[in-house]
Amino acid sequence: MMKAADTIADSRGARLQSGETETREAHLVAHPGGDTLLTIDPSTRSEELSARSGQVAATVSGLTLDVVFPVLHGPYGEDGTVQGLLELANVPYVGAGVLASSVGMDKAAMKLVFAAKGLPICDYEVVLKRDWQRDERAIMNAVVNKLGFPVFVKPANLGSSVGISKAKHATELRTAINLAAEFDRKIVVEAAVPQAREIECAVLGNDEPEASVPGEIIPGREFYDYEAKYLDDTSRTVIPATLTERQTEEIRRLAIAAFRAIDCAGMARVDFLLAGDSGVLYLNELNTIPGFTTISMYSKMWEASGLSYPKLVDKLIALALERHAEKQQLRTSM
C-alpha cells in the first residue's frame, strides 16, 4: 500500500460516478470529462465497473487501487453508503467518512448538529410525509405560524437542488411540499432570508482544516435552483466575493466550525446566506462532495486562494491516505 509521502502521481486511483437517477444527470453535466469516469452500473454485478458506450470500463477483480476518489452526487453516493462500502473493503478514499457524509446529506440532521454547536441557521420546520398525508391543514398551520412567508421547501436527503421550491403563499406551499414528498419521506421548510446573497467557502483538511477565500453565486433566476445550476448559463460567480474583511473572516471561521461540527474530512463546500437588508449571516448547508471540475466553485475558490487544481487533487489524495493510515493504527478490540 502506498504511503502518503510517496509520489501522488504514481498512485493508482479510481473515480466513482453513479448515484440515483435524479442526481446522475446533474453529475454528468457537472463533470463533462465523462470518458475518464468509472460508472457502477446497478443492473450488473457489483464486481463490474462499466461505462456508457465508448467510455472506459474495468473490473474490480485483479484491479489494485491505492485510493478511491468518489465524485458521486445524491443518495448512495454522498450519504455514507459508498463510504461504508469502502470502509468494509479497507480502501482509502477521498473526502468525508460515513458519519459526516450521512449528516451532510440529511439537511434536518445537519441543522440539529449546527444548532447544538451554536452555529447561526435560519428558522426551519421538519415535515414528515406520513404526517403531511394524515393532516395537511395542521401541518400548513404549524409551518405558517412558525415561519410565515416566503419559505423554501426541500427534500431532506437529496442534492443538486432537486425538488426545491420557493413558496410565497399557502397554495404554493402545498404544491412545494407535495413535490418534495415525491423525493423524500422527510421535508425541510426554511424561512427565506431577505434579499439573500449566496456565499460559498471551500474547506480542505482533516483535523486541522483550512478555508479558502469566499465566493458568491449571483443566480440568473429568483434563486439558485436545479435549472440555474445545470441547464442555463445566466448565473455568474464572483471570486473572491465582494465582502468586508470582517465578513470574510467570519465566513471562513464558520466554514471551519461547520466542517468540524459534523467531523468532516478531506473536503467540503460550505454555503451561506447573507441577508442583504441586515447583513446577518446564516449557515445554509455543507456539501461533502462538491462539484469538482476545474470550473467548479470549490476548485475556483482554492485557485483564488493560491492552490492550483493539480495541487488540490494531490492534497486531497494525501489527506485520504493520511486518514486511512491513522485508522490502521487504531485498536478494534480489547
Q: Over which residues does each language-model region extend?
A:
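Short, flexible turn/loop "capping" segments at secondary-structure junctions
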Residues: P155-N157, L231-D232, T294
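A glycine- and small-aliphatic-rich helix-loop capping segment at beta-alpha/alpha-beta transitions
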Residues: G84-Y93, H169, R174, A304-S305
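Active-site nucleotide/adenylate-binding loops and adjacent lid/helix of ATP-dependent enzymes
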Residues: A14-G19, A51-S53, A57-G62, S101-A196
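ATP-binding N-terminal substructure of ATP-dependent carboxylate-amine bond-forming enzymes
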Residues: M1-L99, V103-M105, A109-L112, L128-I139, ...
